[in-house]
Curated annotation (Swiss-Prot):
Disulfide bonds: none annotated. Its main location: nucleus. This is Ribosomal oxygenase 2. It is an enzyme of class 1 (oxidoreductase).
Length: 465
C-alpha cells in the first residue's frame, strides 16, 4: 500500500539495514508502454480505455476489467517480476516482514508463516510448494527498474505516492481473506492465472484496511479469471478475494496502488491550520481566549460550538478570496517520500549540475518539474510569534529509491531551498514559462537574479538553454 506503511515482522538478525540498489532487468524486450510523458504512460497502461472515460465512469466509482489477448503485452508483463527473481533477490539480503511475507488464508483468516531474520529462497520455495503459501514481496520497484520507471511516472501523473506489492500464489491456494483496502488499486497479471471475486463495498472509498467475514459480504458482483497481460482496477473500499485454481501453474500479480490519505478531507485538514494562522493575524476575535475551564468540560458547550461555527463561516469567506493555500504536510510528505526520477545510468545528472553556468544574460528553464513543489510557509528557523513567511522549494531528485514506501522516517530528509517571500514572483515566472531570460525576472537587483538562478542550478532544478 502506498504511504510509508511500515511492514511488520520479527527480523531479529541484526536490525536489517536498507537494501542496496540492484538492477534486475528482465529480458522482456522493448517496453509495451509509452513513457513519453506521465499522461501517455497512464493512457497506455489502461488501453484501450480512454483516460477521459476512465475518470468519468470508473475512478472512485466502480471496477474496470481489461482482458487482453496480446502475447507481446503478456511477455512484457511477465518481465516485470517472476517467481524465479526471488532467488537473486534473496541472495542480496531480504528480511521477513520488511521485504517479504509468507501467508495463507485458512478458514477466512490470514495465517502468517514468516520465519525470523533473513529470508532464504530455498525456505520460501519449500513453504510455497509444501504449505501452499503465498509469497508477498514488498515494494519491488526498489529493485526492478521497469517498475521504478512505471511508478515514478505514475507518481508524476497522480501527484500522489504510488506503491506496489507482488503476490505469488501456488495452485489450489488463496493468500488473503476477503478484505478491502484504503487505496486505489491497479492489478497487473504477470504469470499464470488467478480467479477473482469482487463485492459491493460496505464502506465506499474506505480510509482504512479491513478484513470482511464471508457471511457479511454476500455474493460477488464480479467474478472472472485474470491472465497474463490483463489489468484490473478497483476503487478503495472494494471488497475482494482471489485464489489460484487447482490444476494450474502458480499465479504472480503486482498490485500498484495510490491515493492513500489523498482525499478532500485530508486536504482540508492540511490547509486549515495555515488558513487559521493567517486569519488570526487580522481578526482579533480569533486571538481572544477561550472561556475558563472549557478544556475541563465533559461535553462541548453551546457557547463553544456557536463560536466555532461562526469562526468556520469567517474562514470560509476568507477562503473564497485566497489565492495561496498553506499546505502544512501533504506537499512535503509527497515530495519527500516519492521516487526519484528514473535514470538508466548512475544518476549523476540528478546530483551534479551540468551544462553552462547561468548568468544574467542566460535563458533558463525548469527541469524535473514534476519532482518539485513550491510552497509558502512560516520561517521554520524562527521560534518567536512574529514568524515571517518564506518560499520553500522541495524536490525529490536525491530521494532514495531503496527506501521508497518502506516507512524509514528516521532516514528521511528534505532536499531543497529556501528564499525570501520577495522571490516568489520570480520563482513563479520560472515555473510558468517554457524558458525565461534571467534579466527579466521580477527581482530588484541583478545580483538577486543571478543568485536565484545559481541556487536553482546548483540543485539541478534548472538548465541554461
Amino acid at each position: 500500500m502506498p504511504k510509508k506503511a511500515k511492514p511488520t515482522g520479527s527480523g531479529k538478525e541484526e536490525g536489517p539495514a536498507p537494501c542496496k540498489q540492484m538492477k534486475l532487468e528482465a529480458a522482456g524486450g522493448p517496453s509495451a508502454l509509452n513513457f513519453d510523458s506521465p499522461s501517455s504512460l497512464f493512457e497506455s497502461l489502461i488501453s484501450p480505455i480512454k483516460t477521459e472515460t476512465f475518470f468519468k465512469e470508473f475512478w472512485e466509482q466502480k471496477p474496470l476489467l481489461i482482458q487482453r489477448d496480446d502475447p507481446a503485452l503478456a511477455t512484457y508483463y511477465g518481465s516485470l517480476f517472476k517467481l524465479t527473481d526471488l532467488k537473486s533477490l534473496c541472495s542480496r539480503g531480504m528480511y521477513y516482514g520488511r521485504d517479504v511475507n509468507v501467508c495463507r488464508c485458512v478458514n477466512g483468516k490470514k495465517k502468517v508463516l514468516n520465519k525470523d531474520g533473513k529470508a532464504h529462497f530455498l525456505q520460501l520455495r519449500k513453504d510455497f510448494d509444501q504449505k501452499r503459501a503465498t509469497i508477498q514481496f514488498h515494494q519491488p520497484q526498489r529493485f526492478k527498474d521497469e517498475l521504478w520507471r512505471i511508478q515514478e511516472k505514475l507518481e508524476c501523473y497522480f501527484g500522489s505516492l504510488v506503491g506496489s506489492n507482488v503476490y505469488i500464489t501456488p495452485a489450489g491456494s488463496q493468500g488473503l481473506p476477503p478484505h478491502y483496502d484504503d487505496v486505489e488499486v491497479f492489478i497487473l497479471q504477470l504469470e499464470g492465472e488467478k480467479h477473482w471475486r469482487l463485492y459491493h463495498p460496505t464502506v465506499p472509498l474506505a480510509r482504512e484496511y479491513s478484513v470482511e467475514a464471508e457471511e457479511r459480504i454476500g455474493r460477488p458482483v464480479h467474478e472472472f479469471m485474470l491472465k497474463p497481460g490483463d489489468l484490473l482496477y478497483f476503487p478503495r473500499g472494494t471488497i475482494h478475494q482471489a485464489d489460484t485454481p487447482a490444476g494450474l501453474a502458480h499465479s504472480t500479480h503486482v498490485t500498484i496502488s495510490t491515493y492513500q490519505n489523498n482525499s478532500w478531507g485530508d486536504f482540508l485538514l492540511d490547509t486549515i491550520s495555515g488558513l487559521v494562522f493567517d486569519t488570526a493575524k487580522e481578526d482579533v476575535e480569533l486571538r481572544t481566549g477561550i472561556p475558563r475551564q472549557l478544556l475541563l468540560q465533559v461535553e462541548s458547550t453551546t457557547v463553544a460550538t456557536r463560536r466555532l461555527s461562526g469562526f468556520l463561516r469567517t474562514l470560509a469567506d476568507r477562503l473564497e478570496g485566497t489565492k495561496e493555500l498553506l499546505s502544512s504536510d501533504m506537499k512535503k510528505d509527497f515530495i519527500m517520500h516519492r521516487l526519484p526520477p528514473y535514470s538508466a545510468g548512475d544518476g549523476a545528472e540528478l546530483s551534479t549540475p551540468g551544462g553552462k553556468l547561468p548568468r544574467l544574460d542566460s535563458v533558463v528553464r525548469l527541469q524535473f518539474k514534476d519532482h518539485i513543489v513550491l510552497t509558502v510557509l512560516p520561517d521554520q528557523d524562527q521560534s518567536d510569534e512574529a514568524q515571517e513567511k518564506m518560499v520553500y522549494i522541495y524536490h525529490s531528485l536525491k530521494n532514495s529509491r531503496e527506501t521508497h514506501m518502506m516507512g524509514n522516517e528516521e532516514e528521511t530528509e528534505f532536499h531543497g531551498l529556501r528564499f525570501p517571500l520577495s522571490h516568489l514572483d520570480a520563482l513563479k515566472q520560472i515555473w510558468n514559462s517554457p524558458a525565461i531570460s534571467v534579466k527579466d525576472l521580477k527581482l530588484t537587483t541583478d545580483e538577486e537574479k543571478e543568485s536565484l538562478v545559481l541556487s536553482l542550478w546548483t540543485e539541478c532544478l534548472i538548465q541554461v538553454v
